[in-house]
């Protein structure tokens, strides 16, 4: 989970990396294939994208095969180009004007959330290491890259979203 303020783009996405298969169907020459992934874009351009490695149709002259990364992309703004898609706040304001409070949190929920946040703030006060700052307009602290690199992983950096 990565979140922050003043990052390069304003975007909310859920990125799911699928586990690598225990048996490599493509042979030893394709040992380090990137994992397939599913990106669910919540805002600003709602949609779903799945990226998979697949075999290029046909054979090479040597009888080997080639693989390439392919994307299947559903962008609501493209799929419904003739429709006006309301902004998230428009939907929220319409619901409150209609008297539907289902999209809003109650006071007891807010108090419970602050109980959780207060425990985090208290743990930070007890810690000898403060949260690591980062330069505005970047994807976060430099050390966050090393945090994932220790597990041979890397952060997903969104290509969508509104530039700040």
Cite the ranges covered by each PLM segment.
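Secretory/organelle targeting and membrane-embedding segments
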Residues: 1-164
């Amino acid at each position: 989970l990565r979140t922050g303020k003043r990052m390069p783009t304003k975007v909310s996405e859920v990125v799911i990396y699928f586990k690598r298969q225990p048996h490599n169907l493509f042979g030893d020459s394709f040992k380090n294939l990137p994992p397939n992934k599913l990106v669910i874009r919540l805002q600003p351009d709602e949609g779903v994208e799945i990226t998979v490695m697949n075999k290029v149709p046909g054979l090479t002259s040597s009888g080997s095969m080639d693989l390439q990364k392919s994307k299947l992309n559903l962008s609501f703004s493209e799929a419904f180009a003739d429709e006006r898609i309301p902004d998230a706040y428009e939907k929220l304001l319409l619901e409150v004007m209609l008297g539907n409070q289902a999209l809003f949190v109650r006071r007891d929920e807010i108090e419970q959330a602050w109980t959780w946040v207060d425990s985090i703030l208290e743990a930070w006060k007890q810690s000898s290491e403060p949260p690591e700052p980062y330069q505005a307009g970047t994807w976060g602290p430099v050390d966050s890259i090393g945090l994932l690199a220790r597990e041979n992983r890397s952060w997903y950096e969104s290509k969508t979203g509104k530039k700040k």
